[in-house]
Amino acid sequence: MSEELRSAVIASLEDADATYSTMACDPDLADTAQFCEAYSIPADQSANAIVLASKRPEGVYALFLVLATTRLDVNRRGRELMNVRKVSFAPPDVTATATGMVMGGVTPFGRPAGMQLFVDAAVMDHEWVIVGGGTRDMKVKVDPEVFARLTDTVIVPGLASTIDP
């Protein structure tokens, strides 16, 4: 399964004409804080792909991409953008079912057709960012300008706020 997923991620990057490179990652170090420390990646160059799941109505999922140094406004912005009454972070099993990916590897590339992607505009201010590679053993270094070219994607100013140190 992971080879199929890896191929789908690469195909999505190629289809979007992305400027990117992939890097191997120890699966035990795939979570953002551990990854950044182990591989000397600045946290503000790392972007987290977060799946939100609606509770009312049930069954609506969306992917949100925010810098690791920021916090997604789930209850206000997430709910409004998804046009649902109640929303929460998708637990690992729901994330896997909705995306085919496991936490620590979720990526905007190769996501299921029709799954909306909301990208915090702050992500776009960087020359490159690191995102998941679809699996916990691969990351993708990518020029964020590609996000504006992906289908079902909206760039959202102020989607996330800076985390106080």
Tell me the role of every PLM-derived stretch.
Residues M1-P165:
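Extended, low-hydrophobicity, polar/charged segments
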